[in-house]
Amino acid sequence: MDPEPEIEVALPPSARVVREESDRFFATHGRAKLFGARAVELVFIDGMHRFEFALRDFSNAEAWSAPSGTIVLHDCVPLVPASAAPERRTRFWVGDTWKAAFAIAKHRPDLRIRTILTPPSGLVVIRKLDPSSTLLRERFDAIVKELAGAEYPFEPGAWPPELHCVAADAEGLREALG
């Protein structure tokens, strides 16, 4: 789903692009209506470069996912701290989506989180999902308030331990998907 998708290649017949913002999509569509009895196995979240959106997208996507599924968050390991601000100040910008990864790690220790240090901004791989969990939705306002003014606290190479960073190679990928 994307309100303004920029797709430059032909998609297979089974692919479906929904021209809609994610909040509206999850509020107006039911998983069963779109997928029948099947749960979602893979979700890639590359949203609005704002942690509130990424956190809400994760929570909504997890509710649609299979427990064995995988959710991947993009733009959570900025190259430089200046690119991690909520408002764009640099040419290369990831926004404050990194906060969503920290919030998920802190509030959902039941999840398996591994971060692949892929250039230019990392991929957070989240497994062992619990589609019945409502914890992030229940704590959403408090989490947003807690992290609203937070600055990215790490320099390149000093990766956050709570995100369990792995190399962007075959071994790291096996670890992330393990």
Name every feature range the model reports, one short phrase each.
Residues L11-A15, A39, P109-L111:
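A short helix-to-beta-strand connector/capping loop
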Residues H29-V43:
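A short acidic, Gly/Pro-enriched loop at the edge of an enzyme's catalytic core
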Residues D46-H49:
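Switch II (G3) loop of P-loop NTPases
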Residues P5-E8, R31-L34, N60-A61, R114:
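Short, flexible, glycine/charge-rich loop motifs used to bind or transfer phosphoryl groups or to couple energy/partner
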Residues V9-A10, V17, L34-F35, A63, ...:
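Structural motif
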Residues E52-G178:
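C-terminal substrate-binding/active-site "lid" region of AdoMet-derived donor-dependent transferases
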Residues V18, F44, V72:
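Conserved Rossmann-like nucleotide-binding pocket used by diverse enzymes
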Residues M1-R31, V77-V80, A85:
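SAM cofactor-binding core of SAM-dependent methyltransferases
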